């Protein structure tokens, strides 16, 4: 489910009329997410389960007819654990991303630069002989992302083929813990 808005009035969302409404240079979006997964334990592997929930929202502005700039942020919560005493991890993450798109007639260029703060809670049960202990930690993670993409429209009537090229960079650092 993605909700987006790019108009000068919310009234157009409530009717089926096709009235000409001047288009706003501002756009807003909101996208919730929810993912659940698991894998059963077998002879060769430990099973696990996870849940992720959150949202992304943002706004962009059309500077010119072919130039768009924007800012997006959000929140995600992840809870994952291994079956048995394999441990668990919980993560609260807050991303922020700036982006721009140049969209002339036959090609486009898109780029983004982002940062995500990750706050982890980790737990693992350690059993040795008759002694059982829980190891716990709450490290912080910092993530930087950069992305660039370009594409060109090849108009092959009646088709339009758009070859693209992209480059992505991600750096993740996790605070030390004992």
Where are the predicted features?
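Aromatic-anchored, glycine/proline-accented short structural segments
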Residues: 159-178
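Outer membrane beta-barrel translocator domains of Type V secretion systems
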Residues: 1-161
């Amino acid at each position: 489910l993605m909700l987006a808005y790019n108009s000068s009035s919310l009234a157009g969302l409530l009717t089926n009329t096709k009235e000409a409404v001047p288009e706003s240079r501002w756009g807003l979006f909101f996208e919730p997410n929810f993912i659940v997964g698991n894998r059963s334990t077998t002879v060769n592997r430990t099973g696990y389960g996870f849940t992720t929930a959150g949202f992304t929202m943002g706004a962009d502005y059309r500077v010119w007819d072919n130039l768009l700039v924007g800012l997006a942020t959000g929140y995600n919560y992840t809870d994952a654990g291994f079956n048995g005493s394999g441990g668990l991890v919980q993560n609260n993450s807050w991303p922020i991303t700036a982006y721009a798109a140049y969209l002339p007639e036959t090609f486009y260029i898109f780029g983004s630069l982002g940062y995500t703060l990750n706050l982890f809670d980790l737990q693992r049960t350690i059993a040795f002989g008759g002694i059982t202990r829980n190891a716990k930690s709450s490290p912080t993670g910092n993530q930087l992302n950069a992305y660039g993409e370009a594409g060109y429209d090849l108009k092959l009537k009646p088709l339009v083929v758009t070859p693209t090229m992209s480059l992505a960079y991600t750096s993740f650092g996790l605070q030390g813990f004992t």
